[in-house]
């Protein structure tokens, strides 16, 4: 089973396409949707939805996959549920990058302060990160520097921030899920 968390643009047709591509790894891909506008509510909602879906999961190793803002949540929700996660162009600091896009971006900083201390250290090797060298939204080099002590970093030379084509990375994602 794969839980897919969309980015800030929840209605993008690219989300359906990425879910379709992920079905080459596991036919059971489930969209876990959230508002993107209310971080504290989103966190509670995502925790509840993943817990509900896990009740009906026979897969011994479900995987969280998120893109952009969805990767921010995949890392945290995956950690809190003991799941591996794949972070595609993760938005590590939405309290900064979401200014002017949502009502209360400062809630992300509050969530970070209330999160388990040093959660990445406790989550070492439980996530892999795929970064685009040509991400037009986020600084991929800074993201790599922040995450490389904890997670494997895979680079893509051609995809933009929304990462429409996962095909080149599907074998690595599958191997990570099964490892």
From Swiss-Prot:
NCBIfam families for this protein: PRK04940.1
Entry similarity comment: Belongs to the UPF0227 family.
InterPro entries to which the protein is assigned, alphabetical: AB_hydrolase_fold, UPF0227, UPF0227/Esterase_YqiA
Stored Pfam families: UPF0227
Organism: Shewanella sp. (strain ANA-3)
Domain of life: Bacteria
Protein name stated in the entry: UPF0227 protein Shewana3_2292
């Amino acid at each position: 089973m794969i839980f897919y968390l969309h980015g800030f643009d929840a209605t993008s047709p690219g989300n359906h396409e990425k879910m379709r591509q992920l079905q080459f790894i596991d036919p059971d891909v489930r969209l876990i949707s959230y508002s993107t506008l209310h971080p504290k509510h989103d966190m509670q909602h995502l925790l509840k939805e993943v817990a509900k879906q896990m009740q009906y999961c026979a897969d011994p190793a479900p995987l969280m996959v998120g893109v952009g803002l969805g990767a921010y949540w995949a890392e945290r929700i995956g950690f809190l549920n003991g799941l591996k996660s794949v972070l595609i162009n993760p938005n590590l600091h939405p309290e900064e990058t979401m200014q002017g896009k949502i009502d209360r971006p400062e809630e992300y900083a509050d969530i970070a302060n209330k999160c388990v201390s040093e959660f990445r250290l406790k989550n070492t090797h439980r996530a892999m990160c795929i970064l685009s060298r040509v991400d037009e939204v986020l600084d991929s080099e800074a993201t790599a520097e922040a995450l490389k002590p904890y997670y494997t970093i895979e680079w893509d030379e051609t995809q933009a921030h929304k990462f429409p084509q996962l095909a080149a990375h599907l074998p690595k994602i599958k191997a990570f899920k099964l490892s």
